[in-house]
Amino acid sequence: SAAEVLVDEKNKVYGVATGDMGVSRDGSAKDSWESGMELHAKYTLFSEGARGSLSKYLIDNFDLSEGKDYQKYAIGIKELWEVKEENHQEGLVEHSMGWPLSDGTGGGSFLYHFGQNQVSVGYVVHLNYSNPYVSPFDEFQQFKTHPSVKSVLAGGKRISYGARAITAGDYQSVPKL
């Protein structure tokens, strides 16, 4: 993966460099050591997630957040379920805010009905909560006990799941592109 942004003397991005391979924990070179390589490109697309190290460098180096609001972050948890046919409504999209979160903790949910009796259910919790005991995973589990969600998932089977940090700021917090 990329470890460094390549910038020329005119402050123009011309690619990325990968990290060295075969480096031991103490930083010394192993027998398998190989130098990282430079990948030069006319266009370089950065897509490393909510707060990647290369993105932070680009935002700082090119002052891309000037005049922008601070970015907000959240944790998003998602599960893919195969549900009973009678609980499925292909194309249905549902969103909610709040419950079961307490006052002062932002977040919400989604429930998307895909084809083949598949439903994606997810919960997002903003990471600016003041209660240090808030557990986004536990909030998600409680959310699935809500009658409208529980009835969709009843008798179904979770087939995959995942979680990741996401940006949750509004348009005013998106860096210049």
Q: What would you call each of these model-derived segments?
A:
Residues 151-163:
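A short coil-to-beta-strand element that immediately follows conserved catalytic motifs
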